[in-house]
Amino acid sequence: MNDQLSRAMRLLSQRDHSESELRRKLAAPPFSAKGNWGKRSGAKSSNLVESNPVESNLAESNAIEESDPQVIEQVIDYCYQHNWLDDSRFAASYINSRSRKGYGVQRIRSELMQKGVDKERILAAFENSEIDWCQLAKEVAQRKFSETLPVEWKEKAKVQRYLLYRGFFQEEIQSIYTDSVE
């Protein structure tokens, strides 16, 4: 459990993770200390010196033991007990981070669901965020297309497609034009 706990601590010290994201990373085999990143375990090594079969069997048994679901569950529980892991905190920080990069509600919600955060926590995090999504959509459009937004339908359609891709709702996109007219 100590190896998995140290992996979890290292991962959580770099950035917040959702529970399912951390669980997935802990279940995956760790990178080799020899620098065998991305190589399959069954692939033949190009090294001229063969590794010791006793060491490789020991490493395989440790990898099986380390990816044991009970060990992972204990590590996850330990992280919750020490307040290192919190899906609500993760969702709030993720929303703030992605909104600063110019993404809208739909895109952020989709990404959070892919990371395994449940809908209730996502909704609560959006309700607690104090982000003006209409203003953000306007800032993103002005950053991409210019300070004065286009008025021709072809150019407006381009702005709309871009903002939809970024995850903004149609109402937020329409509001940037109604605000600029007034």
From Swiss-Prot:
It is found in: Cytoplasm. GO terms for biological process: regulation of DNA repair. It comes from the Bacteria. Keywords: Cytoplasm. Residues 43-54 have a biased composition (Polar residues). The keyword Cytoplasm applies. GO terms for cellular component: cytoplasm. Residues 12-54 are annotated as: Disordered. It holds the Pfam family RecX_HTH3. Residues 13-24 have a biased composition (Basic and acidic residues). InterPro entries: RecX_HTH_2nd (IPR053924), RecX_HTH_3rd (IPR053925), Regulatory_RecX (IPR003783), WH-like_DNA-bd_sf (IPR036388). Modulates RecA activity. Belongs to the RecX family. NCBIfam families: PRK00117.1-3 (NF001053). This is Regulatory protein RecX. The gene is recX.
